[in-house]
Structure formats: C-alpha cells, structure tokens
C-alpha cells in the first residue's frame, strides 16, 4: 500500500524514538482518503497534535514525490475506545510524571557550535552517567538559545534507558507545591518529586517568587542528591546572579558543573536553520537561509518561527518562496536593532545596573568601577549600534579610534576568561535590546 511506503520512507528520515512512539501508532484511513486529501488516525490527542505539527508537511512531500500530487494531510483522533489492552499502555508515560518531554528534543537533533559545545558535552555526560558526574548540572544562558532542548535531551535519553524522569518548569513545581499544601497532600508531593531518578527543572530563576517553594526545593534537592539521583536545572543567569534566592540554595546549584550557552555564531545559526528546514520538509534557498541567519536575532525560537511563517504564507498563498517573498513575510520580525538603539540608551542602562551616574561614564575618571562600566558601554555600542570607531571615540571622550579598540579588546579578554562577567554583559545586552 502506498501509505505504508510513505511511512517507511519517513522512518528513514526521523529518529527511532519518534518512529516507535508516534509514527508507528497512526493508521491510514483508506475509506476517507483520496489523492488530494490523506487522512490518518491517531490513538490520542497527544499523538495527533504532535504528528500534525511536526510531520504532516513532510508526509505530504513524500506523497508528492511518489504520486506527483501534494495532498493535504489530516490526523484525526480515534474515538470510542472501549478498552485498553496491555500493549497499548505506554510504559514511558508511567516513568515520566508531569513530564514536558518533547520526543523531538534529542541530542541527535541539537545543532552544536562553539557557543553551546561545552553545555552539549556536559549534558551528554550527565545523561550517560546520571548522579555520578556533574551533579547538579546547571545550564544557563539567554532565552531561546537551546537550554530547554538540552534539558529535554537529557530526559529523553534517560527515559530510553529505563530511568524515572520528572521534567517540569519552575512555575509547574511551584503550582504543584501550592496545590498539595492547600489539599494537605504533601506526602504525595514528596513521593513524586523525591523518588525519581532524574529531576529536570526548567527556568529555575522564577523560584525567587516564593520562599516556601525554595525551602521545599532545598529539601528535595538534598534528598535526591543524597540518593545519587541526577539533578539538572536551567536558568537565564548563573547562580551568583540569581536575585531573591537563599545563599544555601545558590551554593548547592554550584556543587556540580555550571555550563553556559552563548548566542550562536552565524555559521551555527545557518546550520540550525538548515536542520529546521530538513526536519519540517521546508525548501529554502541558501540566500534566504543566510538572510534569516544574518538579520534575525539570536533567539532560536524566533528564528524557527520565521521559518514556519514563511512556509505557511507560501502554502496559503500558493507562491514560490523567493528571497523577496521571505523578506516581506518576516519584515516585522527582523531585529533591526542597530538603527533603533541609541548610545544614550546603552549608557543609561549600564549606569543604572552598575549603580553609577551616566555622567561618570563620559567623564575622565579612572576609578575602577567607572572604567569597567565605560568599557562595557563602548563594547555594547560597537556591538549594537552602527556607529564607527571614530564616532564612538568622540562620544565617549577618547583620543581616537585606537582607544576604542583597546577598550573593546579589554572587555573581550575578560569575557573569554570570566564566565560570571560574560553573563553580566550578556544580561545587559538583553535588557538594552528588549527595551527597543
């Protein structure tokens, strides 16, 4: 049957995990299908939504190759299931409570570059040797750089190897905690979170909202760690920079390994875009890919959103995806920050965060804190604005462009040798760009 051939070909392009857990569960609805409308039936809403979102277009492309006609792919949910057979029960669901795990987030699907290589290797080793190395593992970096992908890659790997995995956001942990306190069912809460092999907490920085939650997580952390269970957390900043956290909790975050993810370089962004296009069966020319990589920001989710929007508009309007078409579709998403960010905005933000006067930055003061703030401003100004070296020299009261270059070089040297300083500069950059 043609549908079987298509599914078999799809299986050659995706991971074994996804094939077994999702694609193998759908059935071709021959009675309701025709050459232009292909219908598959899935056993539940989870599988339906996942396949419709991730694979419908790829399945349609394979049908087009086989028949010359690109059909509309529909995934419907099987209804009126009277009984559940033993073989229908997914053991992984039993082992994964309150799980956010997305099976497409694997180590194999993660695009590695200089900006994330250390975090990637650390995550792999923590997954392969849970509780034995890098425990806890603390992954930090700005929004949309791949922290959640690595966190869930660890979860999916450990799940495949028979471990009990809990994967939740900090908000979910807090909500679960509050609900169990109100219901007086804390024994149930403790049994759930303290008896797992792997505890994964995404965006742990939001624990600052609740001292009671921090207290509970402190004891949860201690018990899991004592039992040699693996703990992995993600955050937008390193432990030392977390505000509103107890020192004893921050110190535990530093017990193991801290791995940062920085904004991807152009080459990595290009490879990420190509991987996304291949995964979703989207055909973009090299000039479009380079345009997206060069002009979008560093947030990978925003880049992927741009790709999805381009493809969706092309399908709806039945147009060929050209560079001009792509530019028009994502023009509102493009991060044209350089023309919008002023030098005064940078000085204002840096001086506020470093608790000095804006006038001090332009002064001749050689006080250590002021010199550092001035250098950070110059570094960010060169990174975020179109101003030339001579223009920056004039604005900051420096002798000439070589003095600007010297200040930028000093900041780069510190960034390369001090992870904490690097995170501070990155946080300042994010605050400046997010205000625009």
UniProtKB/Swiss-Prot annotation:
ATP binds at residues 144, 146-148. It holds the Pfam family DnaA_N. Residues 1-69 are annotated as: Domain I, interacts with DnaA modulators. It comes from the Bacteria. The keyword S-adenosyl-L-methionine does not apply. Its main location: cytoplasm. GO terms for cellular component: cytoplasm; plasma membrane. Plays an essential role in the initiation and regulation of chromosomal replication. ATP-DnaA binds to the origin of replication (oriC) to initiate formation of the DNA replication initiation complex once per cell cycle. Binds the DnaA box (a 9 base pair repeat at the origin) and separates the double-stranded (ds)DNA. Forms a right-handed helical filament on oriC DNA; dsDNA binds to the exterior of the filament while single-stranded (ss)DNA is stabiized in the filament's interior. Belongs to the DnaA family. NCBIfam families: DnaA (TIGR00362). This is Chromosomal replication initiator protein DnaA.
């Amino acid at each position: 049957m043609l549908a079987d051939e298509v599914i078999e070909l799809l299986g050659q392009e995706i991971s074994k995990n996804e094939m077994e857990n999702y694609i193998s569960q759908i059935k071709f609805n021959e009675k309701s299908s025709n050459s232009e409308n292909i219908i598959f039936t899935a056993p539940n809403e989870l599988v339906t939504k996942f396949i419709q979102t991730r694979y419908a277009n790829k399945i349609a492309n394979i049908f087009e190759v086989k028949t010359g006609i690109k059909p509309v792919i529909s995934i419907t949910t099987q209804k009126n299931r009277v009984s559940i057979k033993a073989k229908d029960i997914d053991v992984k669901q039993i082992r994964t409570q309150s799980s956010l795990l997305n099976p497409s987030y694997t180590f194999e699907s993660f695009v590695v570059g200089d900006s994330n290589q250390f975090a990637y290797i650390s995550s792999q080793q923590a997954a392969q040797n849970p509780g034995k190395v890098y425990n806890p593992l603390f992954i930090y970096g700005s929004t949309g750089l791949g922290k959640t992908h690595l966190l869930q890659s660890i979860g999916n790997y450990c799940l495949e190897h028979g471990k009990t995995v809990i994967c939740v956001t900090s908000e979910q942990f807090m909500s679960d905690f509050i609900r169990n306190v109100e219901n007086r069912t804390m024994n149930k809460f403790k049994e759930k979170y303290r008896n797992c092999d792997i505890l994964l907490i995404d965006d742990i920085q939001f624990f600052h909202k609740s001292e009671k939650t921090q207290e509970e997580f402190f004891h949860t952390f201690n018990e899991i760690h004592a039992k040699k269970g693996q703990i992995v957390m993600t955050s937008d900043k390193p432990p030392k920079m977390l505000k509103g956290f107890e020192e004893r909790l921050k110190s535990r975050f530093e017990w193991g390994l801290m791995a940062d993810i920085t904004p991807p370089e152009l080459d990595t962004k290009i490879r990420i875009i190509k991987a996304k296009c291949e995964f979703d069966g989207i055909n973009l020319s090299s000039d479009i890919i380079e345009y997206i990589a060069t002009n979008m920001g560093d947030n990978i989710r925003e880049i992927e959103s741009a790709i999805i929007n381009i493809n969706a508009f092309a399908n709806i309007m039945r147009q060929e995806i050209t560079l001009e078409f792509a530019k028009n579709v994502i023009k509102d998403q493009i991060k044209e920050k350089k023309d919008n960010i002023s030098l005064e905005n940078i000085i204002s933000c840096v001086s506020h965060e470093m608790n000095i006067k804006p006038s001090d930055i332009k002064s001749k003061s050689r006080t250590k804190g002021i010199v550092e703030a001035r250098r950070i401003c110059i570094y960010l100004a060169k990174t975020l604005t179109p101003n030339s070296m001579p223009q920056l020299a004039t604005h900051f009261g420096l002798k000439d462009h070589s003095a600007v270059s010297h200040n930028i070089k000093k900041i780069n040297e510190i960034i390369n040798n001090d992870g904490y300083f690097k995170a501070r500069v990155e946080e300042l950059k994010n605050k400046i760009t997010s205000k625009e």
